[in-house]
Amino acid sequence: MGKKQNNRKVVKSQRKSHREKEEETLAKLQERIDAYDPVVDEKSISQFSDLPISEETARGLKEASFASLTDIQKKTIPISLKGEDVMGTAKTGSGKTLAFLIPTIESLIRNKITEYDGLAALIISPTRELAVQIFEVLVKIGKHNNFSAGLVTGGKDVKYEKERVSKMNILVGTPGRISQHLNESVGMETSNLQVLVLDEADRCLDMGFKKQIDNILGHLPPTRQTLLFSATQSDSVKDLARLSLANPKRVGISSDQELSATPESLEQYYIKIPLDEKLDVLWSFIKSHLKSKILVFFSSSKQVQYAYETFRTLQPGISLLKLYGRHKQTSRMETTMKFSQAQHACLFATDIVARGLDFPAIDWVVQIDCPEDAATYVHRVGRAARFGRAGKSLMMLLPSEENGMLKRLNNNKIELKFMNIKQKNKKTIRPQLQSLCFQDPMIKNLGQRAFISYFRSVYVQKDKDIFKIDELPSDKFARSLGLPGAPKIKFKGGSDNKEKKNMSRQLAALSKSNNEGDVVPEEDKKVRTKYDRMFERKNQTILSDHYLNLTGSKADTAEKSDDDDEDFMAVKRQDHELRDDELPDLSIPVSKRSAKKALSKKASVAGKGNANKLKFDDDGVAHAIYELEDEEDFKKQGDARVQKDTFLNKETELMNNADIEDKLTAKEKRQEKKRKRKEMEKNMRQESDDEDENIQTVVSIGGDDIDLDRDLEHSSADEDVPEPKKPKWFDNDKNVNKDEDDGVVEYDEPQTLEDLEALTSKLLEH
């Protein structure tokens, strides 16, 4: 017993000393933070090791190869460590992710958050890819801390997340899924929340997450630290900051230090090109940059699919990838990882990639379609030249888009250089695209959908000084896609389509989910047969509504009895003038006898008179078949004798022509009849020759019995009358005389047994 008590005392003393050491370390750390003056100490800080942060965080930053601080990190991290709200603005690729992750981890360390305290930090990003990237950086720099972190995004199992979300200290996710967990997950408690981070806040609002963000803010306690970061500052972002931040410190790179919103190491070019030559130029560009890492932006997912499928079939000699919003989560993650790890590759993508994602070492950012505004341009080209690295961008502008877009960019202090395209380097792929569309119906369908989606994307744009849909050559663009003609397009509400395009598709799915968070699939539409429609059919007679009112239930009449007194002496309808469409049709029969008479065809025809046949001339004017002329009209045509002679000559000519045709017809009929007769005679001769060849001679020797069956087999079944017998050899005197004269005896072939005996006796005599 004594040893156990001594061991317990030792353990308690060790725990006490450990706690005292931690408290002492935290106290010193807090002193450093309180003593920090952003105005004085900002220039002296250049490394992460100079910051007043914990040893665990500093070790994680060192192992992740993060050493130097960027401008936004120098200004933001010390203020955030003091616990103040921050509204940060900086250009893309400036290191905003570490600017809010380090203060988040340090805040949890100073508040002594453990795994039993529940949710303490919430980080919200607009896209799944950006959330995954933030989570990966968080794991790298915070692996030496004892916090639990989780990632919740759309496209994953909600039940699996609900079972574990209550045990997380740091939660990274998209607005839609976080809002769903706050509404449905029982164990998700936010009363102990310390830090809220909104990354790419302007993009969250543009994608239609305003309601979800408002819902999230309603669940969070007011005593929290809020960090809001964005590359641009819009009115909606300022409104959000006013609602969620308390006395925020606005941090950003000043205009004196930054001439434009794009990185200084980025070389920016643009070319002026017709719409129908964009794919040819893109193909030529890829073929001439096979040893580069290229990111190509399109305005719609349909264009991404068409370009990917056609270029993949033509095999440019570089790895091709595609990424757009309708991809499944696993496929999107796989594509993101492949492009990040690839040294030379080309990624076709939509604006889903334009925000926050950090792809290492991108050489070229190519914008096939004009961005909707200057902010979108900044985010697109910001994928290259990140963290001071070199990079280039190329934007293709139509002649109708050049002046307006360059004016918008100049207003934001963004200058682009014009690039000429050498015709010898440009290769056309229009014949190959036409061949692919002709051979593969799937590619043809993708081309049609790409055509329609491009025109719709131009139609929904608000800046009509840049996007002029009336000046787009639709027929030439359709032929450049390999299509035989321009498909028909129906345009509907532009503003509604714009909101639907930017809104997250996961929100629509979440609105249809049940209490368990599972998305309820829509019921398949059943095939309705004619019998189903027959049983669903109601009374179609003209008295149906009136009949239902007359045969209403007693309960209905009882309920309406109380209202009858209120309607007493009430004006139902004021006197007014009747319109023509309100007058009744008196021609409709009102009695059964009249209706029966109207259905009788004979009775209906009797009162209508005789029918008149009409003929129509070339102008569509109706004339009677026989029209009588007046005497005056007849005299206007000339003398009667002249008219008579003209009529006779005309009719004579018609008769002569008809006579020639009749003679030719008669001649053809005679020749045809003669040909058939000759053919019939020829067939008869062939049949007779075949019968003669089939005749066989049978000689029976010995025995008195005659084989009648064998004789019948060789007899003709068609012979009704037997042929006359030929004269015998001994009855023919001419043969005898001839034999005597020539010395040669000729005998007929014996046909019967008697002939054979006679022949034998004759031979014996000779």
From Swiss-Prot:
Q: What is its main location?
A: nucleus
**Reaction catalysed?**
ATP + H2O = ADP + phosphate + H(+)
* ATP-binding keyword on record: yes
GO cellular component assignments: nucleolus; small-subunit processome
Q: Which domain of life is it from?
A: Eukaryota
One Pfam entry for this protein is DEAD
Task: Return the motif ranges for Q motif.
Answer: 46-74
Give the compositionally biased regions (Basic and acidic residues): 493-502, 572-581, 660-671, 678-687, 709-738
Sequence ranges assigned to domain Helicase C-terminal in this UniProt record: 265-437
Q: Which Gene3D superfamilies match?
A: P-loop containing nucleotide triphosphate hydrolases
What are the GO BP annotations of this UniProt entry? rRNA processing
Show where the record puts the motif DEAD box. Answer: 199-202
Start and end of every Helicase ATP-binding domain? 77-251
Keyword tRNA processing applies: no
Q: Where is the composition biased (Basic residues)?
A: 1-18
Q: Which PANTHER family match?
A: RNA HELICASE
Q: Which family does it belong to?
A: Belongs to the DEAD box helicase family. DDX10/DBP4 subfamily.
Subunit info here reads:
Interacts with the U3 and U14 snoRNAs. Associates with pre-ribosomal complexes.
Comment, domains: The Q motif is unique to and characteristic of the DEAD box family of RNA helicases and controls ATP binding and hydrolysis.
Role summary: ATP-dependent RNA helicase required for ribosome biogenesis. Involved in the release of U14 snoRNA in pre-ribosomal complexes. Required for pre-rRNA cleavage at site A2.
Q: What is this protein called?
A: ATP-dependent RNA helicase DBP4
By which gene is this protein encoded? DBP4
